[in-house]
Amino acid sequence: MVDIVLVEPEIPNNTGAIARTCACTGARLHLVKPLGFDISDSAVKRAGLDYWYLVDIRVYDNVEQYFKMNGDANLWLTTTKAPKSYVDCDWSGDVTLMFGKETAGLPEWLREKYRDRCVRIPMISEARSLNLSNAAAILTYEALRQQGFKGLKDYGNMKQEESE
């Protein structure tokens, strides 16, 4: 199982796209306030398409409430500042992936507290960061790959005319 935690997300389209990733993978989505948008915002809904009924979404007033209700077992924080790459992580069991807001990332106190559980996605040095929804999808699918894509459809059914 994968849990995705967004701490103070600001851009509704990103949260909607991440919700769609959650819908397609069975991951749970945790949103930590303050949010930079209203959860009913049309941009959020549009980005998630008609998949919202498939999303297990939970909302928290602050980071402290999130930790009080969920703890920190299997928690991994994402930051461009981490020395460790996500490819070096063992996510073969349940995992919680925490992402910060688009403009500033996760608060420094969180990164310091969980320094040994911070990971990054490799990229060129000239770039500041990946899009939040892309980063969430990359790490979610890596965790699911390590978990053997448990619970996901593992076959396709292309018709002859589709492959031509």
Name what the model sees in each region.
Residues M1-E164:
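Post-transcriptional modification and biogenesis factors for structured RNAs
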